[in-house]
């Protein structure tokens, strides 16, 4: 069995006339999602059975279950996870005119729809780093020798960083991105450790001047 990766809107247009419940696999863990599931059930009468786990765990389960899988929909994060699932044939093709009218073409494919987006930002401490310099920073600048031992970032195995590097490769090419990665490593204030929040806290504690982390970690 192949599954659909998309948002809740498509469930109301695709599943409402076929099933009294839908099995939703998700790697997200936010209360706002739960509220959406409740609203969907109230609007359609369709029960949402939620199975939560990290994406790699869900992917492994889907691949092992194959056509016997009970999953109907997957909600996960990051283009890296989407690319992996698409490449491994987990998704079935889907088309929704409703979603097509609401979601820009660069945030959807023949196999999935994007329902949320997040930015990977460069954080700084205004008490120790010039705001004037910071406002003009871009990812490429993180490899500038002037920031030697001033940058913190998660491990390269993290899917958020892998997606960031992929975007740099797409825009700057393999050669320039490889040189950039080496420069970034030279500028690290410490060996990569912890999640995105740990990088922000490192800047707040004065362990580094710059940190790379997703937007939503700032409020945690």
Predicted regions and their residues:
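Bacterial N-terminal signal peptides
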Residues: 6-13
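Short alpha-helix C-terminal cap/hinge motif
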Residues: 35-50
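Extracytoplasmic ligand-binding site segments that recognize negatively charged/polar headgroups
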Residues: 27, 31-34, 56, 70-208
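Short, well-structured alpha-helical segments in soluble
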Residues: 60-67
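C-terminal lobe and pocket-closing loops
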Residues: 206-220
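Sec/Tat signal peptide C-region and signal peptidase I cleavage site
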Residues: 14-19
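Positively charged n-region of N-terminal signal peptides that target proteins for export
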Residues: 1-2
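Cleaved targeting-peptide boundary
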Residues: 20-24
């Amino acid at each position: 069995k192949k599954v659909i990766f998309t948002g809740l809107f498509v469930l109301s247009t695709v599943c409402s006339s076929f099933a009294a419940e839908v099995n939703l696999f998700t790697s997200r863990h936010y209360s706002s999602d739960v509220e959406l599931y409740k609203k969907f059930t109230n609007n359609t009468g369709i029960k949402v059975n939620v199975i939560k786990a990290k994406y790699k765990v869900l992917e492994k389960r889907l691949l092992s279950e194959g056509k016997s899988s009970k999953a109907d929909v997957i909600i996960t994060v990051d283009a890296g996870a989407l690319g992996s699932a698409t490449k491994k044939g987990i998704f079935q093709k889907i088309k929704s005119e409703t979603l097509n009218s609401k979601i820009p073409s660069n945030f959807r494919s023949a196999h999935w729809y994007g329902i949320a987006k997040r930015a990977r930002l460069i954080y700084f401490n205004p008490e120790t780093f010039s705001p004037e310099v910071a406002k003009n920073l871009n990812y490429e600048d993180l490899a500038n020798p002037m920031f030697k031992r001033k940058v913190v970032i998660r491990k390269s195995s993290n899917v958020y960083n892998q997606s960031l590097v992929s975007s740099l490769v797409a825009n700057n090419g393999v050669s320039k991105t490889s040189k950039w990665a080496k420069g970034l490593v030279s500028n690290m204030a410490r060996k990569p450790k912890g999640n995105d929040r740990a990088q922000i806290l490192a800047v707040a504690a004065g362990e580094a001047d710059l940190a790379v982390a997703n937007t939503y970690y700032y409020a945690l």
